[in-house]
Amino acid sequence: GCTPEYCSMWCKVKVSQNYCVKNCKCPGR
């Protein structure tokens, strides 16, 4: 699974290929 904390980390680095970025609500994306 993908925890909010883990998603938040990927949102910060903006790795668009990562499934967390695709499946989580990232601010500004």
Curated annotation (Swiss-Prot):
GO terms, molecular function: potassium channel regulator activity; toxin activity
Main localization of the protein described in the UniProt heading: secreted
Q: Where does it reside?
A: Secreted
A GO cellular component entry from the record: extracellular region
> Which tissues is it found in, per the record?
Expressed by the venom gland.
Q: List the disulfide bonds.
A: C2-C20, C7-C24, C11-C26
* Keywords (A to Z) from UniProt: Disulfide bond, Ion channel impairing toxin, Neurotoxin, Potassium channel impairing toxin, Secreted, Toxin, Voltage-gated potassium channel impairing toxin
Q: What family is it from?
A: Belongs to the short scorpion toxin superfamily. Potassium channel inhibitor family. Alpha-KTx 20 subfamily.
The record's note on its domains: Has the structural arrangement of an alpha-helix connected to antiparallel beta-sheets by disulfide bonds (CS-alpha/beta).
Extra information: Negative results: has no effect on Kv1.1/KCNA1, Kv1.4/KCNA4, Kv1.5/KCNA5, shaker IR or Kv11.1/KCNH2 channels.
Instruction: Report the function annotation for this chain.
Output: Reduces potassium currents through Kv1.2/KCNA2 and Kv1.3/KCNA3 voltage-gated potassium channels.
**Name of the protein:** Potassium channel toxin alpha-KTx 20.1
Instruction: Supply the source organism for this entry.
Output: Tityus trivittatus
